[in-house]
């Protein structure tokens, strides 16, 4: 019986959650409540690729100490599950994180994320689209993943395709790319990932430019979902991008 069967949850979710729980239980005086964690996991090799923790901390805290505390917790959790500890460690990659909670982020987001996307047919990372500008990968990378999946089908590389892009705060390139063609693909998964990295600029700036996300009227996406309508640039593969950027729904 593997870890996922024992926990009835995805292993990366278990690792990330238990890391946060451990930090809460240890009650480090340097750390404050706002904390998030993310694990990029290679299911094929059964190993952790990247472990991220971003935690709020006291104004007086030394960031080196914060990183040591979090890295130790990462190693502890990975070892408890018999997993590798030579993964990429990311702790507060954007730097100091003093102001947190609703004082740092506010807005009505997260309302119907499944209805906004694929109705449960595809995996969803949990980040909402609406209420965020396209510099947030919750929005831009979701649209880009959709576009890439459509391109895979359009080029005849597969009959079905799901693209997953995983990002870490403060890192512009995705820390993980996963391609699932449900046994319909013509290319090995590793080759598909290399093709994606070579073909597309997956930084926030690159995706914004490629899809013309500064020119989209997002009011239209507030109803009937964020996909399926051909005038949206991540859906429209027949118009040149210059035209798609300025197309509006009739």
Predicted regions span which residues?
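Short beta-strand elements
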Residues: 1, 37-58, 101-122, 165, ...
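Structural beta-strand/beta-sheet cores of well-ordered domains, especially the beta-sheet scaffolds
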Residues: 35-37, 49-51, 85-89, 93-95, ...
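Glycine-rich anion/phosphate-binding loop at the beta-strand->alpha-helix junction
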Residues: 62-153
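Alpha-helical support elements that line or immediately flank enzyme active sites
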Residues: 4-24, 132-156
């Amino acid at each position: 019986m593997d870890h996922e069967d024992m926990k009835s949850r995805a292993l990366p979710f278990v690792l990330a959650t238990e890391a946060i729980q451990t930090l809460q239980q240890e009650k480090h005086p340097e750390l404050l409540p706002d904390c998030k964690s993310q694990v990029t996991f290679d299911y094929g090799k059964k190993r952790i690729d990247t472990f991220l923790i971003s935690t709020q901390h006291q104004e007086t805290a030394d960031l080196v100490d914060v990183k040591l505390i979090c890295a130790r917790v990462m190693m502890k959790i990975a070892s408890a599950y018999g997993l590798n500890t030579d993964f990429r460690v990311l702790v507060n990659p954007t730097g100091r994180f003093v102001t947190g909670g609703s004082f740092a982020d506010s807005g009505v987001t997260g309302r119907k994320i499944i209805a906004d996307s694929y109705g449960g047919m595809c995996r969803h990372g949990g980040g909402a689209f609406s209420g965020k500008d396209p510099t947030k990968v919750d929005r831009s990378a979701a649209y880009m993943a959709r576009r890439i999946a459509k391109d895979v089908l359009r080029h005849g590389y597969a009959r079905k395709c799901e693209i997953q892009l995983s990002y870490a705060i403060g890192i512009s390139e995705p820390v993980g790319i996963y391609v699932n063609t449900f046994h319909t693909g013509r290319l090995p998964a590793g080759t598909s990932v290399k093709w994606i990295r070579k073909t597309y600029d997956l930084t926030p700036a690159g995706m914004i430019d490629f899809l013309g996300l500064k020119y989209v009227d997002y009011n239209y996406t507030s109803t009937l979902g964020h996909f399926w309508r051909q005038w949206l640039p991540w859906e429209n593969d027949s118009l040149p991008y210059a035209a798609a950027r300025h197309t509006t729904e009739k």
